[in-house]
Amino acid sequence: AQAKKHKKAKIYIDKQSKIFSSKRFIKKDELLRLISSKNVDTVIAAISGSDGLELIHHSIISGKKVLIANKEPLVMAGEFIVREAKKYGAQIIPIDSEHCSIHQSIQGKRENSISKIILTCSGGPFFNLPKSKFKNISLKQALKHPIWKMGQKITIDSSTLMNKALEIIEARYLFNIEPKKIDAIIHPEG
């Protein structure tokens, strides 16, 4: 939606999409040149997995404001990303989920003034299931999230609460806070 709104936006997608006309797409080498340009001040990093790490690092060493839309880069390389951002004067800003809300709520506060971060999770499809029945859980049951419609991997991560563990790692690096000061609580309404 943002790319359509901003007519001159350049789009790099690691897999070709039918959403936009092909003349709006650019190749990776062109993207790296564009990121380095003085005309670019902000880069949205929304490539899943490790594929986006090179682009994030290039944005950081170019001193850009990097809007991160997923947790994977910080889970894989959080310490490196934060260290490089400080070194090159880049900003790392989360634009996804609870981390975006936390970021917005702590603006203007001293970094060490955060005493605790509490992340919520729905508890997934097995919240009320007795532990004795866990051994009989099927893939179909695990893929039926009570609140969200998501892809298979994120649904399984959510069902097993692994997603929340990854978000704790993400928060640790984004907000420079020790893991013992980050809690996750179940809130069934999601």
What are these regions (language model features)?
Residues 17, 97-101, 119-126, 160, ...:
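Glycine-rich beta-alpha junction loops
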Residues 1-50, 55:
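N-terminal glycine-/serine-/threonine-rich beta1-alpha1-beta2 phosphate-ribose binding loop
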Residues 49-62, 71-91:
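Rossmann-fold NAD(P)-binding glycine/threonine-rich loop
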Residues 101-163:
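Conserved anion/nucleotide-ligand pocket segment
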Residues 14-15, 69-71, 96:
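Short beta->alpha connector loops at strand-helix junctions that form conserved
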Residues 156-190:
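Substrate-binding/catalytic subdomain of NAD(P)-dependent oxidoreductase enzymes
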